[in-house]
Amino acid sequence: MQTLNRTNPEQLIYKDEYLTIEILGGIRLDRLDGLRVTLKMEYEKQVYRHTLDLYNDVQVTKLIRRAAGKLQLGMGTITDSIESLTEELEQYRLDQREEQNGNKPKPVELTKEEIKEAEKLLKTKDLLNHTNTLIGKSGVIGEVDNRLLMYIIFTSRKMSNPLHIISMGASGTGKSHLQETVAELIPEEDRMGVTDLSESSFYYFDTYQLSHKLMLIEDLDGAENALYPLRELQSKKLISKQYVDKSGSKPKTVYRTVRGPVCVAGCTTKEQIYEDNANRSFLIYIDNSKEQDDRIMQYQRSVSAGKINTLEQELIRTLLKNSQRILKPLKVVNPYAELLDLPSSVFKPRRTNAHYLHFIEAITFYHQYQRTLNVNKITGEEYIETTIEDIENANRLLKDILLKKSDTLSPACRDYFEHLKMHLLGQKITTFTNQDISYRLKKSLSSVKRYHKELYNKHFLKIKKKSKQGGFEYEIMSYNEYKEMQENITSILDQTLNKVKQMQKNK
């Protein structure tokens, strides 16, 4: 009797009357046109190992001949075993693929009442603020602007140019928690969580498996090798790889393509991860304030005391997911786009400008049940138009994002610098040394030196004189530069908005 032990996918074990055959490393499930395996064949304590494609007749013949000589077993017996093994592995592969497909969330059929409730939500006046309130009631604590920004970016997965977002902060600050809780408001069939990501793993997805999906990467720090194909997928909306297929009588080059577009969300503690991906993604900094700590701890106490209505939370999550399900893939046209300017100081202005425009479109897209449906008379394509209110909402939500993209300092250094300014002003100190600040701010000397070097090189600090203890005494060149940059960005956005309003008034 032939049996295939499927307990360990990485070490399948086949047994029949004569042979025990281990399939080391398992088999690939993504291809049906080949069956490449590494076999460990055993008969009466004699062992033979061989790697081959079981669909390649030449390789199978060579295996049978060599195994017969090594194991001292008839070629007919080994032939029967290999044929039986091949059939067992084919059935195993089909079963596994069917199981994988069965595990994929299937589109949900909404009832008439559910559709009615979802439409009612999407037609609500002041939709963004109402949505943000619901997000908070669903269990997302604090992070008022970040959570709404993230939700709109996740919504953009349904558009032709999805946006991407990176959550940044130190370990234990709640990056993954924010991403996970907001993602729970997106339908299961439209999102996928990825924990173990390598460069080659992207090519195992089916051609359209990622198309218009939300991809959640919990730890970008551990996925550095996969960032190149990820960037290609974000920018070009597809990735392609060629390999040589040797399963037939003649090797041939085969191309494997995975298509987007895809909305990518990830978390990181490393600034370099952001620097390399900043021109493709929005960056949010997690709220690490004492007030946020207090909010979270109070919520935890309320949960423990049984005072949180978990049923209400689940109903809100379902409502928000259903509202996402009924959003249609409509085109958005922004009639004011040519009037919209960004501060010249922003990092990578061309990309940032595109992100700014796409974010405005995403807000319009989310308001589609409150917009007039227009039809292009030439192409017959349906579309909706951006309103001035959409631009106002985008400016409000993106102000901090644009500020970070305009800042020449790294995010961590900026955070340190603002803390340093507050301390020096409070203590009425004008000059300082590395050792002095390390002691006063309770930061490691190496970190302080690194920050001061960056601040000096970028002309935020100047050397006042040499210190008696060695090193230098520093002085801050301007205490108002960050505030001035904020005011400049606000002023430019306001001026642009006024131009749009004036254009509308003159119509």
Regions of interest found by a model, annotated:
Residues E90-R147, S160-I165, K377-Q435, R440:
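AAA+ P-loop NTPase catalytic core
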